[in-house]
UniProtKB/Swiss-Prot annotation:
Protein name: DNA topoisomerase 1
GO CC terms, sorted: chromatin; cytoplasm; cytosol; euchromatin; nucleolar chromatin; nucleolus; nucleus
Species the sequence originates in: Drosophila melanogaster (Fruit fly)
SS bond list: none
Domain Topo IB-type catalytic as annotated: residue spans: 655-972
Compositional bias segments (type: Basic and acidic residues): 51-65, 72-86, 93-103, 139-151
Annotated region (Disordered), positions in chain: 1-210, 300-416
Biased composition (Polar residues): 11-31
UniProt keyword annotation of Nucleus present: yes
UniProt modified residues of type Phosphoserine: 303
Family: Belongs to the type IB topoisomerase family.
Keyword Nucleotide-binding on entry: no
Catalytic activity, reaction form: ATP-independent breakage of single-stranded DNA, followed by passage and rejoining
Amino acid sequence: MSGDVAAENSIHIQNGGSCEVVQSNGVTTNGHGHHHHHHSSSSSSSKHKSSSKDKHRDREREHKSSNSSSSSKEHKSSSRDKDRHKSSSSSSKHRDKDKERDGSSNSHRSGSSSSHKDKDGSSSSKHKSSSGHHKRSSKDKERRDKDKDRGSSSSSRHKSSSSSRDKERSSSSHKSSSSSSSSKSKHSSSRHSSSSSSKDHPSYDGVFVKPEPVSQQLMHSGSVDAFQMQQLGSYEAAAAGTNFNGNGNVAGANYKNGYEESIVDIKKEEESFNNLSQASSCDYSMSQFRADEPPFVVKHEQSYAEEDSTMNYNDHDDDADEMNDDEEDVPLAMRKRKQEATDRPDGGMDNDDDDDIPLLARKKVKKEKIKKESKEKSKKRVKEEPSDDYGNVKPKKKKMKKEPEPAVSPGKRQKAKAKVEEEEVWRWWEEEKRADGVKWSTLEHKGPVFAPRYERVPRNVRFYYDGKPLELSEETEEAATFYAKMLNHDYCTKEVFNNNFFKDFRKSMTPREREIIKDFRKCNFQEMFNYFQAESEKRKAASKEEKLIKKNENEALMKEFGFCMIDGHKEKIGNFRLEPPGLFRGRGEHPKMGMIKRRIQASDVSINCGKDSKVPSPPPGSRWKEVRHDNTVTWLASWIENVQGQVKYIMLNPSSKLKGEKDHIKYETARRLDKVIDKIRATYRDEWKSKEMRVRQRAVALYFIDKLALRAGNEKDEDQADTVGCCSLRVEHVQLHKELNGKENVVVFDFPGKDSIRYYNEVEVEKRVFKNLELFMEHKKEGDDLFDRLNTQVLNEHLKELMEGLTAKVFRTYNASKTLQSQLDLLTDPSATVPEKLLAYNRANRAVAILCNHQRSVPKSHEKSMENLKEKIKAKREAIEKCESEYHSRDEKKGKQLERLRDQLKKLELQETDRDENKTIALGTSKLNYLDPRISVAWCKKHDVPIEKIFNKTQRTKFLWAVHMADENYRF
């Protein structure tokens, strides 16, 4: 490495103490301009950085003055570790390069436009001697350091006279914090930049020099050569007449606002790009560079950490005072980072390693980090007390990698906040249960949200009767739109639906309209249908901004009306919106389908809230039907709907305490049944032989409820759908076969179950049950009840005698959960993959769904989704074949790829099997209503299956109590 310096600068001292540094590249720096900028916004972070670097460079500059050799290259750097262990002559050579780099650094600090204006006026002093140049550049550097150590927010930081700044200083005045000492301080140690490790402080003539927390590599404290170099540097500094400002800091160091953003531009510094070692031993502050020059930024910025050392130094009393002032300038965030930087395994990167790092790799510092540190500079600085145990041991400094703090976007903050709110769960299951029937002590809510008023369709959207447009009244038009919106639905093809609608449609008409509109077949709703279809498409094609506005409106409504306060806890409401007017559909083949559901008014609604709570306000100009304070019920509002005359409720969300408690009690009751089920089964078997027909019918019905998980079945009125349960079975629903398909005593059930879903099952029963059924069906014709001496009320009273809280639904819940538990034990292979375990779980779930007759029609999208899945499987198989053909000539990497492809194919094939098996089975119904969720939670925990694979978000929220309660050893 050459120690020559080619850059020649001249310094013009102004009367006010300002100076201009003119370099060969023509860039001029005005000291006062930068000084003022630093005064307004500099941070302790940049102060510390610049000071430590200046001291490192100026330590070597003293040898530059004694050696006449100079180089023509800027930004040269040498290995500092090599400097520390070489002879003093060779180390001075390397120091010369650091000095040269420092001179170049000064030139780069000139980023203001005024520096370019003074370019021509100062170019005449370019060709001075090399030693003179370094002397003056050091003088300029001292001024900047002096300015730096004055406070960033107080004007008193600049009250040193210009004469003290203009004093002649030697180029060796700046020592590194690890090697500098003055004639008065013989062994001043290098103080750590972190407040926790500040034990020995360098002092010059009794004055403390502030270091900075940057990744400068320090001299090994145990090295004798390094110590000799320190003392030699101290004596040379004293001989050169080194001066320091009154604040105890090297004068000079003009910086801009902390770390300024600089755009990396490699082409503008080709010399630095060619010499990768230039940035290795010198970490520049971002403010040292012009905005148009590429900064030398180390990839992993580092800070010091305290370590043991074997070299002892003596402290001066004034060091402790300077430490106190110094810590005041350190931002709290910076001190925190210093304290945390303790665990880097490699102990920092030495200079040789630094030299090996490509320049591009060292320039990857995020702009976000720079901006963040700039913001920290504007914060109020917190004074930190100095450590009382300042020892006389110089700690060895270890570089630590500083992880950049990730910038959090507003969206992520909102998600994080929402996550925190979700984690703040009301653990009601850990509270003591109340046995007095009281559901809550305090309840407050805002009431329901009413459906919006009807907005008439545009005048060009018309209703046609008998081919002619007909203008309708507002009420009649609204009724017509109800039907128009469903025009493409299957309901509109049903005669019952159309007849019921037209009957109510005529009720909404004016007398004149009623005279004209008499035949439903002449009504034409097509134009209205087209309008609503176009509106639907328009909503789907809305811009992101429009959708966001709508979303925000819904969220605001949810925030206001979607929550209530119950016993001091915020709970979500399930259906806070009242049902809008429309056409009644009903479940299954309901006889009232198509009837018009009228608009609900405030006068129809009863409110339930706490006595001491604020009663919800009704819409202006109206009043509630009733305000109640009943804490034995869980509903918040109720009304009677006009179609069936049933009471409708606004209830809490399934994830609420009241709903969760109800579920918990249901499953605990089913678990209690497990303890007495054998006794109950023995009882109804004995009753098959009873002399009373009533007892026999009850015993056979209970057998079917237990074995087939049938619903009890209530009697239906004529205006209700004809669905059948166990007690309401009729003769036509049951067929008896002495032998069928190789089975004996077979009973064939075929009847419409809940939601008019067909229940068909061929069951082999015990011989005594078969004979009893033959007895029950004697002398009965089609339409007669099979169990003519039994109803649900009688059955439930008997069940309560067998066990407290026992109902037909408890039997259904018990058998469903018991089936799931046994099927999981049977089908789950602990060594299987997660997809295979999921297939086993779905098969167990499907067994329950079949038991409970949870069927569904094949989804319309099933065929298309299966085709897509088969295409994926085909493509995956082709990829495997191609990979196998290349495998023999490939390395191990190809083998891993082949294994991965096979796993993916297996996963797709399992998915295809699972989807096809479940096309007519509704797994969700049993999962939500009949299966103890703790069984699934325990299975997931035991077999390392993510709970998200079993329960979706809604189900996880509903069963949060189960997730917290159950461990892997839970058994139903």
